[in-house]
Amino acid sequence: MATLSQDQKQLVQEKAKAIRVSIVQSVTAAKSGHPGGSLSIADVMSLLYFVEMNVDPSNPKKQDRDRFVLSKGHAAPALYATLAEKGYFPKSELINLRKINHFLQGHPDMKHTPGVDMSTGSLGQGISAACGMALAGKIDNADYRVYSILGDGELEEGQVWEAAMFAGHYKLNNLTAFVDYNGLQIDGDIEKVMSPLPIPDKFKAFKWNVIEVNGHDIDELHQAIEEAKAFTDGPTCIVMHTVKGKGVAEMEGQAGWHGKAPSEEQGVAFVNEIMGVQ
């Protein structure tokens, strides 16, 4: 399997840092939002959009594009930051996050936001839609792949497992799902709220190929995605061991930052921390 070049790896790391900066800035400006679970997926978002996926900001609806569905729709700040970084719309728009009548709503809206393939927010519906897209691709003999990111708390939704059963039954080998396994949800530790563990075994039971990785290691993520592309017997689930709030020490591993915005002073400090400014 092909490894990342140094240039590719550097690009992904630089874009992940830029995505994290934009997440903090946009949520701070909005005075509301979900920074913790947005920061935890910045690395995989950067890798997908700047290396792995076949997408074109100048033609966002092209038929042969790869599809992406953010099933954990509350992490919209990460998706918007990535889309802006990729060139779907100006980065200056990010400060309008969650403003009434703006195209960057609190959860992804496919009718108004360039580059968004599916409206999400109600947990469990995103992965279900991703399964439908993947099946449509099979029926049409299309070459595109479908990627979806789920939260670990989202796995408490029964609809997720209906979708998992569906994907395994139809052997949707053009579908790759990522689980953002940071161990925390809005009410605290996922094992105490409603444990979805063991996550790998559950997906394996539904005939998925399962790979576990460090969700902040670009090389591990890339190799897992390459393996998913090569696997022909069904869908792949990449379980990413991540840190909620990754990149901001005060947020890391803290459930309290699931849906809380930084103050203006904190926002400046957090951005400086991400950028390495003393």
What positions do the PLM features span?
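Glycine-rich ThDP/TPP pyrophosphate-binding loop and its adjacent helix/strand module
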Residues: 55-67, 103, 107-278
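Anionic-ligand anchoring segments at beta-strand to alpha-helix junctions in alpha/beta enzyme folds, i.e.
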Residues: 90-109
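Flexible, glycine/charged-enriched surface loops at secondary-structure junctions
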Residues: 35, 94, 237
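Alpha-helical support elements that line or immediately flank enzyme active sites
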Residues: 80-89
